[in-house]
Amino acid sequence: MSLLPHLMRLVEEQHLSAADAEAAMQIVLRGEASHAQIAAFLIALKMKGETVDELVGFARAMRAMAVPVSPNLEGATLLDTCGTGGDGAGTFNISTVAAFVVAAAGVHVAKHGNRSITSKCGSADLLEAWGIPVAMPPEATAFAIREVGIGFLFAPAVHTAMKHAHPVRVDLKLRTVFNLLGPLTNPAGATAQLIGAPSSHAAELMAGAIAALGLERGFVVHGSDGLDEITTTGPTLAFEVRNGKVERRTLEPADFAVAIAAPEDLKGGDLARNLEIADSVLAGAAGPHRDIVLVNAAAALVAAGKADTFLEGMALGVVAIDSGAARAKVKALADFAASR
């Protein structure tokens, strides 16, 4: 099999069917395409523009070739909070901190993420600074999700076939379809998600894709300021996915009873700065950093069915932080990893 026929169709601005997209991704993941071919494929796809069918096909191939992580929750909801990364906004690790808040509120979390590729500090970088090794064996990660309430799915460890495309991504230093696919390919089978998208168009595509892929409930969000999170600087476009249906919504800071923030209030920095911010939020410090973590945790709790409304989710998040439970989840995961 060759990637070239699929590449030529993209060059001619023809869309791939879901089946053809799946076949093309299988070629990439099996190492049957050169780096030059992969780079050309990614750029041609980016210039043409991705479709829902293409995302569905790519995601199916990646899911099928991922290392399985099976927490065996016996019907309990499993949530992922994952952005596409690389939004260029320079914020701190909002979805990662929110994941621990959600776990402390009683929802099992399978946090899917990676090291920084196009930003200064990825979710994996922050976790390691907390003493949490990110590349635990799948069995250990599954146990952590089940018993600690949260586990980290390190993309290179669970998507080992991505090693064939990783050097290309690093060299290109561009956001590609793989940024969109990360949140669509959780190998633990998350049934609820809060997904951050890099644009309103990408959010709509990703929502259509996860609906087609069978997600029970979730939100795909894009802030008006460009954040791949629910922002607190203004409105956020949200696509709510529920049992195959997609509903377009606009979320405002007032929906969560938080003050409107200035963009500079949400800035992070390098690993040291992001660690400082994350620690201060989990220690209970008030301010815009806390607000945006709570807002995203609240939406995640609604997606998981733990809260019926965003305000209920906010209340659960406040308790999780101010009781020390969220910070305790960080320590519990670090202690669990150290004991393995």
Curated annotation (Swiss-Prot):
Binds 2 magnesium ions per monomer. One of its GO terms (cellular component) is cytosol. InterPro entries: Anthranilate_Pribosyl_Tfrase, Glycosyl_Trfase_fam3, Glycosyl_Trfase_fam3_N_dom, Glycosyl_Trfase_fam3_N_dom_sf, Nuc_phospho_transferase. Mg(2+) 1 binds at S95, E229. GO terms for molecular function: anthranilate phosphoribosyltransferase activity; magnesium ion binding. 5-phospho-alpha-D-ribose 1-diphosphate binds at residues 83, 86-87, 91, 93-96, 111-119, 123. It is an enzyme of class 2 (transferase). Its EC number is 2.4.2.18. The keyword Disulfide bond does not apply. It catalyses: N-(5-phospho-beta-D-ribosyl)anthranilate + diphosphate = 5-phospho-alpha-D-ribose 1-diphosphate + anthranilate. Anthranilate 2 binds at R169. One of its GO terms (biological process) is L-tryptophan biosynthetic process. Its cofactor is Mg(2+). Mg(2+) 2 binds at D228, E229. Anthranilate 1 binds at G83, N114. Keywords: Amino-acid biosynthesis, Aromatic amino acid biosynthesis, Glycosyltransferase, Magnesium, Metal-binding, Transferase, Tryptophan biosynthesis. Belongs to the anthranilate phosphoribosyltransferase family. Homodimer. PANTHER family: ANTHRANILATE PHOSPHORIBOSYLTRANSFERASE (PTHR43285:SF2). Catalyzes the transfer of the phosphoribosyl group of 5-phosphorylribose-1-pyrophosphate (PRPP) to anthranilate to yield N-(5'-phosphoribosyl)-anthranilate (PRA). This is Anthranilate phosphoribosyltransferase. It comes from Solibacter usitatus (strain Ellin6076).
